């Protein structure tokens, strides 16, 4: 079922009973289910289920102690030639504070841009996710890009300059502070980067949390 956003997670006697959606036709519909896996992030999942009072105090204490999302910054730009020839991977930087990595999607998939145009994407993050200064640190990310590739900012045509946080962050929890996959509500599970198993991060953690939830459910 697509284009059917979840409006509520129904809980009775500490057990999940289903969800309420707005279906593709625009009608409110209740779906009965003994198991619910949410990928909306811990904060949104708690809200959909009715708020903190629905969950055990220990679960909410863990949630509130480290309720810090991980903002991310993103710049997409095009150049007439790639910053590095014959490179179809991901450059991860060790000499920067805010710039994390740079990719050249046009080198990975040439059909993504017109001939002679090379799309580049750079991602960065604040030095302290709890106290981000996104405007200043975004400019620092660009400065670090320039330091590694002198002249790039003058040559680049920027398509996207974005900062992601709040309800749509880089990750729903700061690294190392993920919530458990299982909640204190029976049958309700969280998957995604907000519930990162130890040693994982980002997209990898989303997949790992899904596997962990499957193991818990299937036994």
Question: Across the structure, where does each feature detected by a protein language model lie?
Answer:
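Short loop/edge segments at beta-strand edges and connector loops
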Residues: 2-4, 192
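Mid-domain catalytic core of redox enzymes
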Residues: 4-117, 129
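Conserved flavin/dinucleotide-binding core of flavoenzymes
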Residues: 102-219
